[in-house]
Each structure stands twice: as C-alpha cells, then as structure tokens.
A protein has these predicted regions:
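Signature of the first transmembrane helix
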Residues: 2-65, 94-102, 127, 162, ...
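Helix-loop junctions and terminal segments of transmembrane helices
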Residues: 60-76, 275, 279-294
Length: 294
C-alpha cells in the first residue's frame, strides 16, 4: 500500500510539473508574436531552429535514458557504474558534436540557410549539447525517486527562461528608449531573435550547476563490455525516437523550402507554428474536459 501511495505521489509531481511547464512555455508564444515583427519572420526562425535542435537532442541522448533504467535495475549490474558509463558516453558524444559543429560552423549555417546568423546556430549547438548531457542526471533523479528536485529544476529552468525573455524582449527595449546609456553596452534592438537563444543558453548553463552533486562521487571508468551492451540495447530506441521526433518536427524543417522566397517561407512558418501551439493548448483543455465529463 505504501508503494502505491509513493507511486501516486511521484506521478502527481511529475505530471503536474510537466503540465505546468508546457503551459508556461506556451505563454511565450503571444510574447514572441507580439514583439517580433511579422514581416521579419522572427518566430519562423525560432520554430525552424528549435525543430532541428529537437531532432539532434534525440540523437545525442542515443536512447540512453531508457538504457540507463534497463541496466541500473538489472540484477548483477552496479547502478553507479551504469550511470557513470552513460554519462561518459553521452558527454563524449555531445563534446564531439560541439567540436565538429563549431569547426564547420559557417558551412552548417549556410546549409541551414542562416549564413548571416551563424551565431544562432552556435548558441543552439551549445544548448542542445548541454540539454542532452543533462538528460542523464535527470534520469538519475528519477531512478533515485527524487521527483521534487526533478520538478523543481525543470520549473526553475522554464520560469528563468521566461523572465530572461521578458527582460530582453520587453524591459530592454523600453530602457533603450528612455535611458539608452544604461544598456547600449550590451543590448542591440535589432537582435531580438538572437536574445531568445541567448536566454535559452543562459538557463541551460545555469541548470548545469544544479547537477554538480549528481556528477560527483562516481568512478568514471569505461566498462567496454557494459557500454557495448547498453549501446546495443539503446540503438533501436534511438531509431524509434528519431522517427517519432521527425513526425513532430519535419514540417517546421521543410516549410521554408516550400517557398521560392525564403523570407516569406519564414513568415508563413511563424504563423503556422503559432496557430499549431494554440491548437495544442486547446487539445489539452478538451482532453481534460472529456476526462471530467466521462
């Protein structure tokens, strides 16, 4: 009975943090559509870049979250050794990804058709590498049955990101008009889209600090046999994950290519992405009502 109560409590914490997090993230949509000029295609750029990062995040985690739980709960395997090996694998893969992408940053930016904004691409490379690595400590918190810290970090990241967006997109433009001398040393009024990525990068870096306790006290030695087994187990999960995320994001990747004018494609993508977010929230409320009514 105690186990069922604990399960119900953990489910409530994970579920509420997920629902609240999604709703808070949705609040950024009206902010972006109000602040970013429609003709600039700014929100289209944001949607397009985040679509690529979602795909890369799945690749870099390599299905190792599920693999970690499988082997950490397997009789005969040391959970700490499993965790350390997963950390080293995902961390090494993320570092290699960052090094490779930053080396070929400008060709990648040109391929994605952001030749004048390689900085956007660079920031999101760092963000997706940090986020993929942090997926493993998050999994470790779940394994240790610590839902409060898990949910607290998630919500802190979301709230912090929202506050930074409000700072860069609302407060800074106002200060720039009334007292430009206060912020003109770091603020560029024409860099609004870039500040969205800056806010994300700041919060991803700050979030890393919360995981320092989950990174200490482990023996970081590669067990080749164990790692080989985990990779073999996780690889099919990676494939299914890539297929699943492509189903959710491929539209935002290819949308700009459907137009002869790239800029017009980004404008239309921004409209499309904003309306799809509205539909998503409506679906959440509809589902909640249906559950209550039935």
């Amino acid at each position: 009975m105690a186990g069922l109560k604990s399960l119900a409590k953990d489910t409530a914490i994970y579920g509420m943090s997920s629902i609240i997090g999604r709703f808070l993230n949705y609040l950024l949509v009206p902010l972006y559509t109000a602040v970013l000029p429609a003709a600039s295609g700014g929100y289209g750029v944001v949607s397009n870049v985040y679509a690529y990062t979602a795909l890369i995040l799945v690749f870099l985690t390599f299905g190792m979250e599920t693999g970690f739980f499988r082997f950490a709960n397997k009789a005969g395997d040391d959970p700490k050794k499993v965790y350390a090996n997963v950390l080293m694998f995902v961390g090494g893969l993320s570092l290699a990804f960052v090094a490779l992408c930053l080396t070929f940053l400008h060709p990648i930016a040109s391929f994605l058709e952001y030749p004048d904004h390689a900085d956007y691409v660079a920031m999101m490379i760092l963000v997706v590498a940090l986020d993929s690595f942090q997926c493993i400590p998050f999994a470790y918190l779940r394994y240790q049955k610590r839902p409060i810290k898990f949910a607290g970090i998630k919500l802190f990241n979301i709230v912090g990101n929202i506050l930074l967006n409000l700072f860069f997109l609302l407060l800074c433009p106002w200060l720039y008009k009334v007292q430009p001398g206060l912020i003109d040393w770091f603020y560029d009024p024409d860099y609004l889209v870039g500040y969205i990525f800056v806010a994300n990068l700041i919060m991803s870096a700050v979030q890393m600090l919360f995981f320092i306790p989950e990174l200490r006290g482990f023996s970081y030695r590669i067990d080749r046999k164990l790692l080989k087994e985990m990779i073999a187990y996780s690889f099919p999960i990676l494939i299914f994950g890539l297929v699943g995320i492509l189903n959710q994001t491929v539209d935002k990747m290819i949308y700009p290519f459907l137009f002869e004018d790239r800029q017009e494609g980004l404008v239309q993508l921004g409209i499309y992405s904003a309306t799809s977010k509205v539909a998503l929230v409506m679906a959440m409320f509809t589902q909640a009502f249906r559950y209550a009514y039935e």
